[in-house]
């Protein structure tokens, strides 16, 4: 497994263009740092892909535990990087403003490691159950497992409703599982176990004990999940409206300020589908002009996020 050599990193250029369209000042700090870290490791890989990818054989049997830290931050090529980090961009904007920067950093770090651990457990279990040792040698890189975990969180905080996947309405609570199958039907080169591990980690946080365990550990470190931006508390009610409330610990009057919902600022006026269409068009153009074409690492960006954005914007405008 070697990173493909390409004359022009079209995916990276497209990613940087999208970041600058959003505006660096509009991206929360932990989200921005996550983007920068993924880009930095792509441009300056610490090890070759084969030495940083995650597998049962290399990580568990040969005790190369550093792969748990390296594998989420390495990507096979610029398109693999683009699809993952473009998804990090909008998920980070939504979740970091809801959870607070310190807690979001804690979530990202925990999910990055735990997704790898669950991936190893899944691969080991399948290899033993099917008596097929090749599963122990299957090696994976990329941030998409963490993205699936974040998608579970996002659906948890915005419950109800349906999303359109391949033309079929799917309840929000099942969307991740349907996307998991759809991605691997159309992009068989992606890691099914890695994405499934992300979903399971997300469910461990929203439905299981993970959040309480993290809160208990965070209490020892002096911060909790209620921490937000200084001087502000995020509010969200069942009708779908949200915003920020100034918080004064000494009893000054509270008032609400609606959080800006102009998502055109974040997407340069393009929906998720339009961004994906442009990316795929650029990918096809690039494929026709280079000898080495990108592998099917395209992360499926479903239209659910754009539908949710429009719904929230409609509530805010009432």
Curated annotation (Swiss-Prot):
Disulfide linkage: none
Main location as per UniProt: endoplasmic reticulum
Residue spans, topological domain Cytoplasmic: 1-21, 128-137, 205-318
A Gene Ontology cellular-component term: endoplasmic reticulum membrane
Membrane-spanning segments: 22-42, 107-127, 138-154, 180-204
InterPro entries according to UniProt: Peptidase_S54_rhomboid_dom, Rhomboid-like_sf
Pfam families: Rhomboid
Keywords: Apoptosis, Differentiation, Endoplasmic reticulum, Hydrolase, Membrane, Mitochondrion, Protease, Serine protease, Spermatogenesis, Transmembrane, Transmembrane helix
Domain of life: Eukaryota
Active site: 144, 195
Family matches, as SUPFAM superfamilies: Rhomboid-like
Class of the enzyme per the UniProt entry, highest EC level: hydrolase
Single Gene Ontology MF annotation: serine-type endopeptidase activity
Regulation: Inhibited by aprotinin.
Stretches the record annotates as VCP/p97-interacting motif (VIM): 303-318
Membrane topology of the entry: Multi-pass membrane protein
Protein task: Intramembrane-cleaving serine protease that cleaves single transmembrane or multi-pass membrane proteins in the hydrophobic plane of the membrane, luminal loops and juxtamembrane regions. Involved in regulated intramembrane proteolysis and the subsequent release of functional polypeptides from their membrane anchors. Functional component of endoplasmic reticulum-associated degradation (ERAD) for misfolded membrane proteins. Required for the degradation process of some specific misfolded endoplasmic reticulum (ER) luminal proteins.
Protein name, UniProt field: Rhomboid-related protein 4
Protein species of origin: Pongo abelii
This protein's encoding gene: RHBDD1
